[in-house]
Amino acid sequence: TIQRNIKTDTEIAGSLYKKRISEAEWDVIYIDDEILDLQPCFASQDASKERQEDNYKGVHPLLFTAAIDLGTTTIVGYLLDGRTGETLAVESRMNPQMQYGGDVIQRANYALEHGEDVLSACVRKVINEILESLSVKARKAIPIDIENRKNEVTNEKKEANEQAVNGKLGSAEWMPGVEDIYQVSLVGNTCMHHLFLGISPASLVHAPYMPAISQSLTLRAADYGIHIHQKGQLLLLPNIAGYIGADTSGCLLALRQDLKDEITLMLDIGTNTEMILGNKYGLAACSAASGPAFEGAKIQCGMRGLRWRRSLTRQRKPI
């Protein structure tokens, strides 16, 4: 029975009764109060008996979540086991918005002049590439119990799965993929947050420099071009101020300065650096641009420490 405080759609609601009376074992995948999917649990013949004895050893469907740090210069993605919270894979890419401006002010001005669509589209494309790469890496990180699934796939598919597990070509329906990601949590500074969502950054470049959206958001990932499970969620943490964004909110959640007796200082050093000072009695936050120091912005000589940089050494010959 679906409780009144549980949200789902008519397709899943109609499937619940059919699958409840079938002989197969099913897992209900939900986040908070929303049912997202029903997946078969690949189990042995004694699965029902084992489940009654609370010693169930069936192979559950894959369940991933992902975390995206949308930085001004670098975008980093983490793939996590949705049941244990274990980090399974990490992947990073350069932020393609750099071609439209090295810092948030330049990008905001570009968006005001040319629109937000180009900046939104390019960063969503790279996030999808990161998620795809993470799912490929997960194929090597997760132990797949092929023996328990052998009755669910043909011998041909089994051989392909074994090859995929060994890092070779080949795949099958139950191998890890982006469709097994049910939630993506995304953080970034306020400008990156707005440009990702396609929101005008005008409020950030004019006084009083306030974000257009401050509260946390739970959205349907597909509505914003993020390719995960078709009903997967996109979670964005709240922005604090015009240049203190959701990435700082993530730091606060991790460090919990608001619960400490002693005064602590948190530094998030990047192209835009944020600082929070305080304890459980109060917190103060500020930000400052660090691009010139760490990213090589507006320097006359030299370059950023990129992977493909070259060092030249000049030797002096004695006269």
Where are these regions (language model features)?
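Short beta-alpha connecting loops at secondary-structure transitions
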Residues: 111, 235-239, 291-299
